[in-house]
Design a protein with these regions (language model features):
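Conserved beta-strand edge residues that scaffold enzyme active sites
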Residues: 6-7, 59, 148-149
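Short, conserved phosphate-binding/catalytic loop or strand-edge motifs used
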Residues: 16-20, 156-159
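Short linear elements at protein peripheries
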Residues: 79-109, 113-129
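Glycine-rich FAD pyrophosphate-binding loop
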Residues: 1-16
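Dinucleotide-binding Rossmann-like beta1-alpha1 core, especially the glycine-rich loop
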Residues: 18-101
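Helical element adjacent to the flavin cofactor pocket in flavoenzyme catalytic cores
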Residues: 114-171
């Protein structure tokens, strides 16, 4: 059963970043296990929903001399962790290459940049595709019916209560 208080994919799903990243931010924290897990999940999504997810290049401009090698080396480590699941190699970019990729970047003080690959997906379409798949396998989907409480018996969850926001009826 799927209960949604508003439109399907209209809440948190609609406010997502639309990125299916392999955990590059976790690399900065030194959390290698989480990077590996995120890379695995990214690969799974790109494989299972190629019509909804695709590789996307990112370019980080560098305005300080140390930024290109610093971020570039970290992103090369990201590539190494991705292994065969990598979406493209990290590239060190010259000033002119960076401006070609980012024509609206501030040219004053630009030293170069780094280009790396992650993923992007259509979150609303994915949520709807998953809901349709669940329905085709017998799940009940109800929108405009929010959960209002949980029913416990003998310390165990036994059910829930909900309210139909169109009729005002409680279930």
């Amino acid at each position: 059963m799927l209960l949604e208080s508003h439109d399907f994919a209209g809440g948190t799903s609609s406010r997502a970043t639309k990125l299916v990243h392999g955990g590059v931010r976790y690399l900065a924290q030194g959390n290698i296990a989480l990077v590996r897990e995120a890379l695995h999940e990214r690969t799974t999504l790109l494989h299972n929903a190629p019509h909804l997810a695709q590789p996307l290049a990112f370019v980080m401009p560098s305005y300080k001399i140390w930024e290109t090698p610093f971020y570039g080396v970290g992103l090369k480590m990201y590539d190494a962790l991705a292994g065969k699941a990598g979406l493209g190699p990290t590239e060190f970019l010259s000033r002119s290459e960076t401006l070609a990729c980012l024509p609206t970047a501030r040219p004053d003080g630009l030293k170069g940049g780094v280009k790396y690959w992650d993923g992007q997906f259509d979150d609303a379409r994915l949520a709807l595709a998953l809901a349709r798949t669940a329905a085709s396998r017998g799940a009940l989907l109800v929108n405009y019916c929010g959960v209002t409480g949980l029913v416990h018996e003998d310390g165990k969850l036994k059910g829930l209560t909900c309210r139909d926001s169109e009729t005002g009826r409680n279930f």
